[in-house]
Regions:
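Compositionally biased, intrinsically disordered linkers/stalks adjacent to structured regions
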Residues: 117-140
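A structural "domain/chain start" motif
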Residues: 1-42, 47, 134-140
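Surface-exposed short loop/turn segments
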Residues: 39-45, 53-96, 104-118, 126
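Second-shell loop/turn segments in exported
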Residues: 15-22, 111-119
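A residue-level signal for beta-strand positions that form part of recognition/binding surfaces
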Residues: 8, 51-53, 98
Length: 140
């Protein structure tokens, strides 16, 4: 839960350090986390010197084949995104953490990845943001 003394938050740009770069991923993840904090808390956005600060980086963005068939082709592929997040709470530093969050989604290997990439990224980002938010502000 959020301490009553915490009034402001900031989400620093989450940079992309993955080998495979998806151009909008950093911006989308940063903005989704900011939006979730604005919509689901009474906290106010503050560009710097906020009571709580999220920062981090995308460290992995990759596709790997899943469920290999008899003809040795994959029926499914898995897109995985891993992010390292640092959470700093200037009011209660016992809440501070550095954690890796990871989510994936599977898709049919017959689908054109380029055509579904944005949709898959949206699904994974929503799950990552939920986990980051819960870990920082719901304390589960």
């Amino acid at each position: 839960s959020i301490s009553e003394n915490v009034n402001t938050f900031c989400v620093y740009y989450i940079k992309n350090n993955a080998q495979l770069i998806q151009p909008n991923l950093s911006n989308n993840l940063t903005e989704e986390l900011k939006t979730k904090c604005l919509n689901e808390t009474n906290l106010t956005w503050q560009e710097k010197d906020a009571d709580i600060i999220f920062s981090g980086s995308i460290n992995d963005y990759y596709i790997k084949p899943m469920s290999i068939q008899n003809n040795e082709t994959a029926a499914q592929n898995r897109l995985t995104i891993k992010v390292n997040i640092t959470y700093k709470n200037s009011i209660d530093d016992s809440q501070n953490f550095k954690k890796t969050f990871s989510h994936y989604t599977d898709f049919d290997s017959s689908q054109n990845f380029v055509e579904i990439e944005d949709e898959l990224n949206s699904i994974i980002i929503a799950n990552l943001v939920e986990d980051i938010f819960n870990s920082a502000l719901v304390n589960w």
